[in-house]
Amino acid sequence: MTLNFSVVTPSYNQGQFIERTIQSVLAQTDVAFDYMICDGGSTDETLDVLKKYQDRLRWVSEPDGGQADAVNKGIRSTRGDIIAWINSDDVYYPEAFSKVQRIFLTQPEVQVVYGHANHIDQEDKFIELYPTEPWNYRRLREVCFLCQPAVFFRRRMVKDYGDLDADLRFCMDYELWLRYGKQTDFFYLSELLAGSRFYHDTKTLGQRVAVHYEINDMLKAKFFRSPERWVLAYASVLVEEREKVKGRDVGNLLTPVQRINEFCAEAFHGYRRWRNLAVSPSTIWQVSRWTIAVYYHWLRSKVNF
């Protein structure tokens, strides 16, 4: 017995990478699948690449409402039992589909399977292992430990609990995992399934302030309060971006606490008063904790998280 996979790729001006994505999908074996690419009207070499493979996949190129809208369109245009969503700059590793199919076939109660992924550079070279963790929904609220191309889910999840939130620009995958995870436990497959492209021009890395703002906003809407970990992550990104604007090398700053302290120098009038008290390591630690706490509550008041 086999399951039919539906593979969906949203695309926009990723001509330098999309052929590698396509080849990684078409190289999958022992699994029946159909492949749909929803392009948003690319103006680079993307369409030439798609035409090259059009006898082995389906594609459409037209204006859309963004990445989430393109994925939703692809899901609606396919009929497979298992949905695999991979962006146009990522890759699957050999036998990924067959490994995932084995779980879905032998454990019919499992609705979502996820595995390990690598961060890779523009030349497909290994950077680091994505920090995937065993399933824990409470932990998922604190940190997104699922790498998007390494997640596969049954179509019934879409039918029962909806598709991607097309109003989100960055964290539509994280929101979907939180929504689905509230309904069922995900199966953690300890296998390397995908490579996620990690470079400066990726949407997530290139717009970090907007990404973290949207994540906090989404979490507040879903859980009425954004976890402290995400608020402080947003604070750290704000400080780093501020340093870049000032033309300084963020990597040379000593610690995250120092970054936050410096940011607070402009945010709080009491900075000089408490800094003068920092005469011993223990006092410095107490002051740093106070700074972070005050900054944390100030940030919540400013961004309403």
Residues of each region from the PLM?
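Conserved nucleotide-sugar donor-binding catalytic segment
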Residues: 129-218, 223, 230
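Conserved donor NDP-sugar-binding/catalytic core segment of glycosyltransferases
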Residues: 91, 95-127
